[in-house]
């Protein structure tokens, strides 16, 4: 009787253990464009955003990486997905000015898209990004001349110090997800993008003067 009880207990334990094992699924991996290639070439230094307190702390670490002539590989774990995103920023010791012509510009301050700064600082929540991307895709002048490929997007991004790191994570997940959704199987560079992390309030910068 005692032996029967022990055997039953073992069977129940094994069954429960097996069920728990079946519930554990490996997290999916989402990689931004060129991430794996740059990692293979040892041009990335990984930052797990779970180890970062806020945006100020993040951009400080990214700047140190930039001064080593490397890019930041940003890792975000959320639910069943690990997001692997390339982040760009400037090295404080480098006075070189970046040249960003022929781009589709997207500006994000905190968790809001800054639209038409000339229009009294009009903003939309980050969830509006899909609509913005669809609008860019629909306009022929946003494409590279004579190619089925959009001009690359330059996303200028800043988050105020008062916001938690979860704000940064949310925005980066949205960017990665929305751009991944428009990638074509036969044209992976259809709409490439770069995220430029800056340390100033983008929404307060006046727009460029209109052409004469």
Where are these regions (language model features)?
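Sec-dependent signal peptide recognition
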Residues: 3-10
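C-terminal motif of bacterial Sec signal peptides marking the signal peptidase cleavage site
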Residues: 15-18
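Long, low-hydrophobicity, acidic/polar, solvent-exposed interaction domains
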Residues: 20-212
């Amino acid at each position: 009787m005692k032996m029967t009880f022990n055997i039953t207990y073992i069977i129940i334990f094994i069954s429960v253990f097996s069920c728990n094992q079946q519930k554990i699924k490996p997290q999916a991996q989402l990689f931004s464009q060129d991430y794996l290639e740059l990692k293979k070439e040892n041009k990335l230094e990984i930052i797990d955003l779970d180890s970062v307190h806020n945006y100020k702390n993040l951009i400080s670490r990214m700047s140190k990486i930039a001064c080593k002539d490397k890019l930041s590989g940003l890792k975000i774990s959320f639910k069943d997905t690990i997001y692997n995103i390339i982040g760009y920023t400037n090295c404080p010791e480098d006075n070189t000015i970046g040249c960003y012509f022929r781009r589709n510009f997207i500006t994000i301050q905190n968790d809001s898209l800054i639209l038409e700064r000339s229009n009294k600082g009009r903003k939309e929540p980050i969830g509006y990004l899909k609509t913005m991307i669809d609008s860019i895709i629909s306009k022929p002048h946003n494409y590279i001349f004579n190619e089925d490929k959009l001009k690359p997007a330059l996303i200028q991004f800043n988050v105020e110090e008062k916001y938690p790191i979860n704000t940064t994570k949310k925005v980066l997940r949205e960017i990665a997800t929305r751009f991944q959704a428009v990638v074509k199987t036969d044209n992976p560079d259809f709409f490439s993008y770069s995220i430029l992390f800056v340390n100033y309030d983008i929404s307060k910068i006046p727009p460029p003067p209109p052409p004469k």
